[in-house]
């Protein structure tokens, strides 16, 4: 029988063990670096016991108090991993550090839980896939553009409807996820698998399972408990992985055989499937769509943001011929700016550009402070995106902030002209020290060009072909640990534009 005294005694033993683990961990951050919370080990205990939202407040307070003055600070959270948040001024220095000094790979293995959920994962495979994306996908937009448009056209019409006489309610999260999943799949695995619902469900189910388990392990669980919790989470992840491989393995096998025939000159290049699987063998999401749509639909409808995007899209895409030319997407400057602004206002995580000091001798910060091996370095992503030093009126939604024009003129509610001053012409896919959604430096997201490309296609197609009722209030969000995403239950009301309008557009 477990008594109160037994529980207290057991708790004291656990606290003692955790304290020993904490003290024996090789990494001890120098005392001269400022702390948001004081108390060492007890600060981590409080972070673990308090609601997870407190880390948002800690990082915001540390950014305002220290980072804005050019000083790094220490953040203590439930993971018990020593982390130093560097100011924006240090990003140039971080970018120049070699991989042997600062590693993004070791952080990725911990943050995604891969070390415990998929211990057989090969780091070389990650480098390989990155190379495939950089060398093939970003250079072959035109070769996949027609397929992208076909999937966009078919999936959007199927989900949002073709009926122009009545409004219908749809779940925004499900709609965006399904459309983007099919567009991405047509490049990843090609036809007919990209339209096979069971195939799509198998690998997206595996990704969802990995995301949930990885978040629990990497963002919440103390580092010394991860091996134990990983043993409990590994079986369901392994099951979903095997389920997805039942579909994907035959696809890779088929491509491998065709490539072998091609290398023996019995198969022409035109006959060779042109998709991501083929590129992988030869070389061997984000919710961005949702937050962009939600920002546009919750903005003041009298300002005319949506109408401007409709005008831009209808000018660029007059016929189906325009859709199958990848270069047409580059004309969507206002759409690109709207996506970038939503990524600025709604970062997926409060931290990014995280690296681990792996050199045996540690690493010296620009301030002269030396960090020991094992320290994590990160940036206050959300706070940088809302810093008035980098953005005028940072809390205000300005979807055309990044358009290369002197000003965007609109009519306010009272009829007076309102002028929104954009910063400068910067594409969504551009890596910039003020916008870190896609990372920074050599380890920035290699698929950002493709992501930006399909997002602009999706928003353009919807604005051209559908009317959507504005939202009545700010959209709900779900927060957990470092992450914030739109509520998956948000509904929008849509209606297909009538044929007369669409025919008039094509003239």
UniProtKB/Swiss-Prot annotation:
Give a yes or no for keyword Metal-binding in this entry. Answer: yes
Q: What class of enzyme is it?
A: oxidoreductase
Q: Which PROSITE patterns match?
A: CYTOCHROME_P450 (PS00086)
Q: Which positions are glycosylated?
A: 352
User: Membrane topology type, per the record?
Assistant: Multi-pass membrane protein
TM regions (residue ranges):
1-21, 205-225
Q: Any idea which UniProt keywords this protein has?
A: Glycoprotein, Heme, Iron, Membrane, Metal-binding, Monooxygenase, Oxidoreductase, Transmembrane, Transmembrane helix
Q: Where found? A: Membrane
**What EC number(s) does this enzyme carry?**
1.-.-.-
Where heme binds, per the record, is at 445
GO cellular component annotations, sorted alphabetically?
membrane
* Gene Ontology biological process terms in this record: secondary metabolic process
Q: Which cofactor does it need?
A: heme
Instruction: List the Gene Ontology MF annotations in alphabetical order.
Output: heme binding; iron ion binding; monooxygenase activity; oxidoreductase activity, acting on paired donors, with incorporation or reduction of molecular oxygen
Looking up InterPro entries in the UniProt record yields: Cyt_P450, Cyt_P450_CS, Cyt_P450_E_grp-IV, Cyt_P450_sf
Q: Which family does it belong to?
A: Belongs to the cytochrome P450 family.
Q: What is this protein called?
A: Cytochrome P450 monooxygenase nodZ
Per the record, the gene is: nodZ
